Amino acid sequence: MTPLLRFLNRTSLVTQIVIGLLAGIALALLAPAIARDLAFLGKVFVSALKAVAPVLVFILVMASVANHRHGQETHIRPILWLYLLGTFAAAVVAVVASMLFPSHLALSTSEASLSAPGGITEVLQNLLLSAVDNPVNALLNANFIGVLTWAIGLGVALRHAGETTRTVVEDLSTGVTLIVRVVIRFAPLGIFGLVSSTLAQSGLDALLGYLHLLAVLIGCMLFVALVMNPLIVFWKIRRNPYPLTLLCLRESGITAFFTRSSAANIPVNLALSERLGLHEDTYSVSIPLGATINMAGAAITITVLTLAAVHTLGIQVDLPTAVLLSVVAAVCACGASGVAGGSLLLIPLACSLFGIPSEIAMQVVAVGFIIGVLQDSAETALNSSTDVLFTAAACQAKEQRNG
């Protein structure tokens, strides 16, 4: 065995990711030209994750449902309640922070052509259409609502199949999981490429003009990750929540921060759930579902940026209206999940509830894209790490009750 292989076997994946992160920063500062050329490493890694995620979810969920025995329990309902509670709590935190530290934007015109939803009804219609999408189309376009619908439907149908068929489905699930593990082993190289190229191309100059807005956004996300989420987990498991919280942030949040896609981070969360010894019938459904509907980070982004526009335009808004807006916007945000920067497209919808015209709302979206290097990364890290955190909390709480 070569010294390199021995080193890789001895050090944990997280340590290797941190080394890749530091090496990426160093390369971007010392040799920006080389760093820009290494962007393909990050692109290959993210593409591999995105390629494997829909297949993984489809096979895992189908196998889980098909092999579910009558009398076995899944804990999806309490996890769904945790997702909703976490998103609502994040929205409230964002509203309070925006009221205490109002941000003002230097709004400029945006040349980007974005297709934002026209209203809440349209978003809900799109979600329903996603659920009844062609299964091949859903897999090709990583439409996770459609993938979940077909996986659950086929899983239920295969419950009545012979034992041999169900064994084949289970073996397929094991095979896909093995491929995912191989992809995840390349995370340090992928993150090295992502960090070095992003810093070399954007630099930090683009962020300096929006430091206050970024401070409010990142501050809210840190508060939710380190205070609100642990409080919710403590209420659920009745013991110190921080070991589990920090583990999820370290193992899931770091990779999500750099891939900037909840969908791409699904394989990482599934692998972490397996290592934590969680209930497979539960996490194989709740993790991909969380990547679609658990949008605490999106709730913060939509609320803070919308209220920044509100403050800039001098519109008066009372607290209940602001909370209601952020909850409605966060619920709608699931329509743009799994896409890097997806939550920004919901800002025009949120702004319309305050009577802010689309032209100005699109300028706010442009501001969002300028700070997106940090905003979208932090948002995805919060969203994705919360998926596995709440799944683990619900499973552990159930185990404690069962003794």
UniProtKB/Swiss-Prot annotation:
Species whose genome carries this gene: Pseudomonas putida (strain ATCC 700007 / DSM 6899 / JCM 31910 / BCRC 17059 / LMG 24140 / F1)
GO MF: neutral L-amino acid:sodium symporter activity
Gene3D superfamilies listed in its UniProt record: Sodium:dicarboxylate symporter
Protein name according to UniProt: Serine/threonine transporter SstT
Annotated function: Involved in the import of serine and threonine into the cell, with the concomitant import of sodium (symport system).
NCBIfam families, alphabetized: PRK13628.1 (NF010151)
Record membrane topology: Multi-pass membrane protein
GO CC, any one term: plasma membrane
Keywords of this entry: Amino-acid transport, Cell inner membrane, Cell membrane, Membrane, Symport, Transmembrane, Transmembrane helix, Transport
Pfam families with a match to the protein in the record: SDF
UniProt-listed GO biological process terms: serine transport; threonine transport
Bilayer-crossing regions: 14-34, 44-64, 79-99, 138-158, 175-195, 214-234, 295-315, 327-347, 353-373
InterPro entries reported in the protein's UniProt record: Na-dicarboxylate_symporter, Na:dicarbo_symporter_sf, Ser_Thr_transp_SstT
Similarity comment: family membership: Belongs to the dicarboxylate/amino acid:cation symporter (DAACS) (TC 2.A.23) family.
